[in-house]
Amino acid sequence: GAYASFRSTLSAQPDRVATGLTREKWLLLLLRELDYGRVPTTQGGHMTAGADGDVRQYPVSHKWADVPIHLMGWGVDLDRRTEGVAGAARAPQAMVQEFLNRSDDHLWALLSNGRVLRMLRDSSALVGQAYLEFDLEAMFDGELFSDFVALYTMCHQSRLERLPGEE
């Protein structure tokens, strides 16, 4: 399948970060299977959040409807900054969480490096971070079908789609 093909190509890749490969050969395919269709990149390579003269830009890579989706490379740690890697000048987790907390227009986001997939929620009313994490590497290396069912159930586009009239 797509994951096995991606891992085979990844093992021959000299680039330890492998952002393009991870996105094109793995994560965008996974998102299609979760019914997001073709997920476009963000306009200008960023999204903005904030108000009253304190609007900031966040280097979120993709967006589906009103859901920010930040896709990093296999070699990028989501909890630490990776110098020289676009979208990881700050820890990707912290950056996406701050974006959600500062935005009035976004409640959910997806974040992944191909190894794990996180579904984040605006947590401005909570202390700390608010996310579910799915270990994609363990799930697909170990063929853990029941874990994939949980991922599919929680992260399917229908879970994050804002219906008309919802705020």
Regions found by a protein language model. Give the residues of each.
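N-terminal accessory segment at the very beginning of proteins
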Residues: 25, 43-46
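Short Lys/Arg-enriched alpha/beta "domain-start" segment
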Residues: 39-40
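Proteins with a high burden of low-complexity, intrinsically disordered sequence enriched in S/T/G/P/A and R
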Residues: 15-19, 57, 167
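Solvent-exposed, non-transmembrane amphipathic alpha-helical segments
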Residues: 46-51, 137
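His/Asp/Glu-rich acidic catalytic environments and adjacent acidic regulatory segments
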Residues: 43, 53-55, 147-148
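Short, basic/polar, glycine-containing "phosphate-handling" surface segments that engage DNA
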Residues: 1-14, 66-67, 71-167
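Conserved catalytic cores of phosphodiester-cleaving nucleases, focusing on short active-site segments
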Residues: 26-27, 31, 36, 50-83, ...
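Charged, often low-complexity linker/regulatory segments
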Residues: 1-33
